[in-house]
Design a protein with these regions (language model features):
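Active-/binding-site microenvironments in catalytic and ligand-binding cores
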Residues: 1-197
Length: 197
């Protein structure tokens, strides 16, 4: 796992004329993006991701899941039957409700995630980015990181630990996800913004 983030006071107004702190954290802390390089040696690194991939039309798929439950290909197809086909090069965001367990000990171990068939289906549609309100796009118990591997090989971006998805009242919206441009990094904390008409 990753260390707990910490803020280290470094300068202060009284002694230095200004306040400044140091920040120690994993690049995969909080709401964050995985670059393909996180799992593929020759995959794109976070600083190499183009702005075009970070600004897109997005579909919000609401599929409440309990711990250890898969988001399936059928879940996605049910959404498409009701709301229309998901466009190529768009983003897909899954609202499972798992964020409500953020303070629970099992949050990082028993989370829901995508099934391999669901991941392959999204990859076949040339989806740009997939996001979820859990700590991993894979099931917590998947030590092979099966879905990460599928997406990384296709150059797809992953955003994990999304919050406040319940505030998005539309199945379609405009998504902006802004990582830090950290050279050669495997990921970055992000600010994810939904614009709903």
């Amino acid at each position: 796992g990753s260390p707990q983030p910490s803020f280290i006071p470094w300068e202060n107004v009284k002694e230095d004329g200004y306040n400044l702190e140091l920040l120690f954290l994993s690049t995969h802390t909080g709401t964050h993006m995985d670059a393909p390089y996180h799992f593929i040696e020759k995959g794109a690194k976070i600083h190499e991701i183009s702005l075009e991939k970070l600004v897109s039309e997005a579909a919000l798929i609401q599929c409440r899941k309990n711990g250890g439950e898969f988001i399936t290909k059928i879940d996605i197809q049910k959404f498409e039957k009701k709301h229309g086909k998901i466009a190529s090069f768009s983003s897909v965001i899954f609202y499972t409700g798992w964020q409500r367990n953020l303070q629970k000990k099992y949050y990082f171990e028993k989370n829901p995630g995508l099934s391999v068939s669901a991941a392959k289906y999204l990859a076949s549609k040339k989806i740009n980015l997939v996001g979820i309100d859990s700590p991993s796009i894979d099931l917590g118990k998947d030590s092979k990181f099966s879905v990460h591997q599928i997406f990384a090989k296709k150059g797809m971006l992953i955003v994990e630990n999304l919050a406040n998805l319940e505030k998005i009242k539309s199945s379609k919206f405009h998504l902006v996800v802004l990582p830090l441009k950290l050279k050669n990094a495997t990921g970055s904390p992000v600010r994810a913004i939904a614009f709903v008409e």
